[in-house]
């Protein structure tokens, strides 16, 4: 995302007060569109959370549109975005363009029910969280228990949001599980597949 932001085009608008220029993401933010593009980390999470809170302050009833193209990333950073999406009053509509893997798919399915969508050639991946802690054996056991609890929490939330049983998602997430958009629709991660933008969409 940081590399992408270095190549951001500018948009110039004319008004009665003269000419104003915006980077493309700022201009889209005015339309209540937020991009999650690239790996999920603390920096990206802070930016997305700040934009969610800003748009809610502007209008707590008007939908926010979160466009996702992400391979996933840090679980804690993803949970920060998930909790913020649930915390704000404005409904968050999610759309996968490209891919939504790991924490990306978690955020995709966390959108407002009925508004979670994907483009036809998007790909979606679910799996259990992983960790790479090194250190003393006693500390490794502590971290292993934390990962186990995180896995349980994520599995439960997938099941709740998607209308499936805990056991179904526990089995599906045991290894990397790639899905087409049609499979994601059947599993309840999304509500629809969009080929053309609808008038009501952002």
UniProtKB/Swiss-Prot annotation:
Q: Which gene encodes it?
A: clpP1
Q: Which GO terms describe its cellular component?
A: cytoplasm; endopeptidase Clp complex
Matching PROSITE patterns, A to Z?
CLP_PROTEASE_HIS
Which E.C. number(s) belong to this protein? 3.4.21.92
**Superkingdom assignment:** Bacteria
Q: Which keywords does this Swiss-Prot/TrEMBL entry list?
A: Cytoplasm, Hydrolase, Protease, Serine protease
Active-site residues, as the UniProt record annotates them = 102, 127
What is the protein name for this chain? ATP-dependent Clp protease proteolytic subunit 1
- Supply the InterPro entries for this chain: ClpP, ClpP/crotonase-like_dom_sf, ClpP/TepA, ClpP_His_AS
Catalytic activity, reaction form: Hydrolysis of proteins to small peptides in the presence of ATP and magnesium. alpha-casein is the usual test substrate. In the absence of ATP, only oligopeptides shorter than five residues are hydrolyzed (such as succinyl-Leu-Tyr-|-NHMec, and Leu-Tyr-Leu-|-Tyr-Trp, in which cleavage of the -Tyr-|-Leu- and -Tyr-|-Trp bonds also occurs)
**GO biological process: what's one of them?**
protein quality control for misfolded or incompletely synthesized proteins
Q: Where are the transmembrane segments?
A: none
A GO MF term: ATPase binding
Q: What does this protein do?
A: Cleaves peptides in various proteins in a process that requires ATP hydrolysis. Has a chymotrypsin-like activity. Plays a major role in the degradation of misfolded proteins.
Q: What is the lineage of its organism?
A: Bacteria, Pseudomonadati, Pseudomonadota, Alphaproteobacteria, Hyphomicrobiales
Q: How does the annotation summarize its subunit structure? A: Fourteen ClpP subunits assemble into 2 heptameric rings which stack back to back to give a disk-like structure with a central cavity, resembling the structure of eukaryotic proteasomes.
Q: Which family does it belong to?
A: Belongs to the peptidase S14 family.
User: What is the organism field in this record?
Assistant: Agrobacterium fabrum (strain C58 / ATCC 33970) (Agrobacterium tumefaciens (strain C58))
Where does it primarily localize? cytoplasm
Q: Where in the cell is it found?
A: Cytoplasm
What Pfam family is a match for this entry? CLP_protease
């Amino acid at each position: 995302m940081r590399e992408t932001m270095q190549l951001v085009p500018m948009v110039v608008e004319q008004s009665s007060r003269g000419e104003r220029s915006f980077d493309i993401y700022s201009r889209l933010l005015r339309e209540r569109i937020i991009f999650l593009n690239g790996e999920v980390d603390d920096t990206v999470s802070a930016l997305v959370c700040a934009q969610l809170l800003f748009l809610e302050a502007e209008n707590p009833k008007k939908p926010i549109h979160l466009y996702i193209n992400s391979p996933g990333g840090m679980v804690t950073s993803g949970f920060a975005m998930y909790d913020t999406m649930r915390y704000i009053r404005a409904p968050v509509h999610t759309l996968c363009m490209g891919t939504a893997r790991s924490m990306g798919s978690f955020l995709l399915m966390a959108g407002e029910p009925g508004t979670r969508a994907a483009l036809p050639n998007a790909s979606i991946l679910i799996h259990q969280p992983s960790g790479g802690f090194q250190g003393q054996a006693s500390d490794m056991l502590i971290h292993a228990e934390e990962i186990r609890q995180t896995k349980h929490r994520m599995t439960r939330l997938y099941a709740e949001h998607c209308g499936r049983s805990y056991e179904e998602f526990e089995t599906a997430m045991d290894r990397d599980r790639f899905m087409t958009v049609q499979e994601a629709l059947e599993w309840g991660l999304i509500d629809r597949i969009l080929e053309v933008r609808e008038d009501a969409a952002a």
